[in-house]
Amino acid sequence: MFKAIVSADTLQETLDSVSVLVDECKIHLDDDTLSIRAVDPASVGMVDLDLAATAFESYEADGGLIGVNLSRLEDIAGMADAGQLIQLELDEETRKLHIQIDGLEYTLALIDPDSIRQEPDIPDLDLPAHVAIEGRDIDRAVTAADMVSDHIALGVDTGDDLFYVNAEGDTDDVHLELAPDQLIDLDAGDAHSLFSLDYLKDMNKAIPTTAEVELELGDEFPIKLHFDIADAQGHVTYMLAPRIQSN
């Protein structure tokens, strides 16, 4: 059983956070939380999302599992104006999701969850560096790096106590340094890893510029990015595998 009413903004923000990595996913409909965990086809980027029942105007669920085509659901949600309410109800017999938006009614065929890629186990890494940064600074770094390269290095300099971003192209380079007074928080530890800029660009699309983003970094280790959505009623974690640099 699943029946809910949610604002268009909250639903769109939730779907966007996942669709930057995958086209389809499993959605767990627990009695107090909607949750999604998925990995992209190349097993490079992962997403773990929880949206509390309190993020909804109303929410009833009993532990079901559904599979959805994210692009189709996003298209439907995109028909709603900002602030409008969207009604969702699962028909368990037909395995279809009924969606109502201000008089418009849609019936979305669901996907067999067993046909969707297995959900990843996101490792509990004890990474040495922790950085809290504003979403707008991540956006600035990614945008600048994209002008010169297709990969980006993120790290922490423990000697100078700062977080840095490097991007090296064939002819041009980008370097950004942020000291503790330019960050929300910095727990310095040895960290330097190279990442695909394409993945970070996609993740960046879903990160609000006003969000506080917590980064966990290591030396040639995956990066974890944590941030809240839906007025802190939802939480997203991205994990991105590094590009291993040859000596």
Swiss-Prot record:
Write out the GO biological process terms: leading strand elongation; regulation of DNA replication
Cite the InterPro entries for this sequence.
Answer: DNA_clamp_sf, Pr_cel_nuc_antig, Pr_cel_nuc_antig_C, Pr_cel_nuc_antig_CS, Pr_cel_nuc_antig_N
Q: Which PROSITE patterns match?
A: PCNA_1
Q: Which UniProt keywords apply?
A: DNA replication, DNA-binding
| Molecular-function GO term, any one | DNA polymerase processivity factor activity
Disulfide-bond pairs as recorded: none
What is its quaternary makeup?
Homotrimer. The subunits circularize to form a toroid; DNA passes through its center. Replication factor C (RFC) is required to load the toroid on the DNA.
Give the family this protein belongs to, as stated in its UniProt record: Belongs to the PCNA family.
Q: What does this protein do?
A: Sliding clamp subunit that acts as a moving platform for DNA processing. Responsible for tethering the catalytic subunit of DNA polymerase and other proteins to DNA during high-speed replication.
Protein's name according to its UniProt entry: DNA polymerase sliding clamp
Q: Whose protein is this, by species?
A: Halobacterium salinarum (strain ATCC 700922 / JCM 11081 / NRC-1) (Halobacterium halobium)
